[in-house]
Amino acid sequence: MYYFASDIHLGAGGEAFAQQTERRFVRWLDDAAQDAEAIFLVGDVFDFWFEYRGVVPKGFVRTLGKLAELTDRGIRVVFFTGNHDMWVGDYLARECGVEIYTSPQQFRLNGKNVFIAHGDNMNIDGQPVLKFLNTVFRSRTLRWLFSWLLHPDLAMRFGHWWSGKSRKSHGAEAVSYTHLRAHETPEHLV
C-alpha cells in the first residue's frame, strides 16, 4: 500500500497546537506503517525547516524518531520538499534514512507511472511575483547568505514569521489542483 501526506506544517501555531499536530501525524504514520510499502511526504511537512551544516531545527523529535524507525523497518519514506521546507539538506536522509526529492518525480507504483509533486512551483509562468519569489528562495546564493549571516535563532524566528505570513495569505483550507490539460493528464491522477 502507498500512503501520501502533505502540508502538515509541523511547528505552525502555538506550542500546544504544534505538539498536537505532531502527535496526530505520528499516529497517522503508525497507522500507515501497518501495511505500507512506501510513505510519500509531498512537501510542507515542516512549517519551516532550514539546515545549517551542524544545526537542524529544534523540536520534531517524535516525527524524526518515527521516520527513522519506519526506514529501519524497511518501509520506504519519500520526502518531497515544498515551499515551507525547501531548505532541507541531507540530515533527514543521513539520520532518518528518508529519500529526499527537491523537484517533481515520476514513480512506478502498482504498475502505473505516477507523477508526484508538491506543486508550489508548478504553473507559475503567468505569475511574475510568485516566479520571482520561487527563484529567490531557491537560490544557492540566498541559502549561503542565510546560513552564514544569520544566527540560527534569528533565522528560525524570521523563517517562522515568513512561513506564517505565506501560509495565511491564501485563505484556503484545501487545495484542488486541476489545471492539467487533457493531453497532459496521465491516466491516473493522485
Locations of regions flagged by a protein language model:
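Short, well-ordered, mixed-charge alpha-helical segments that flank or form enzyme active sites
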Residues: 86-90, 116-117, 123-126
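Active-site-proximal beta-strand elements of phosphoester/diester hydrolases
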Residues: 1-9, 113-120
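Core catalytic region of metal-dependent phosphoesterases/phosphodiesterases
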Residues: 5, 10-109
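Active-site-proximal loop/helix segment associated with metal-binding centers of metalloenzymes
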Residues: 119-177
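Conserved small/polar residues in nucleotide/adenosyl-binding loops
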Residues: 178-187
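Short, flexible active-site-adjacent loop segments at beta-strand->alpha-helix junctions, enriched
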Residues: 83, 104, 113, 118-121, ...
